[in-house]
Swiss-Prot record:
Protein name according to UniProt: UPF0045 protein MJ1052
NCBIfam families, per database record: MTH1187 family thiamine-binding protein
Protein family per UniProt: Belongs to the UPF0045 family.
InterPro entries from the UniProt entry: MTH1187/YkoF-like (IPR029756), Thiamine_BP (IPR002767), UPF0045_domain (IPR051614)
Domain of life: Archaea
Organism annotation: Methanocaldococcus jannaschii (strain ATCC 43067 / DSM 2661 / JAL-1 / JCM 10045 / NBRC 100440)
Pfam families according to UniProt: Thiamine_BP
Amino acid sequence: MIFMRKVVAEVSIIPLGKGASVSKYVKKAIEVFKKYDLKVETNAMGTVLEGDLDEILKAFKEAHSTVLNDVDRVVSSLKIDERKDKENTIERKLKAIGEL
């Protein structure tokens, strides 16, 4: 069986030097992710993306730059889970641990 090469990625974009509340910057980053052909799930500590790796990389770069436009410093991280042996989706991963 051939699977579409989806990846699941966890993204965190943190603006520094703008006080304790960063929600307005997080919202801007999420708006960028939603412009792309990606599944976007936000949680309390980051955002999980599902889709084509190239789309995720483009969206990540744009979201990082968008936040950096408003602040002097941004720390961003991107974790990518890519596999060839089975379909890789957020839903499959949650089912595997009994969370869905």
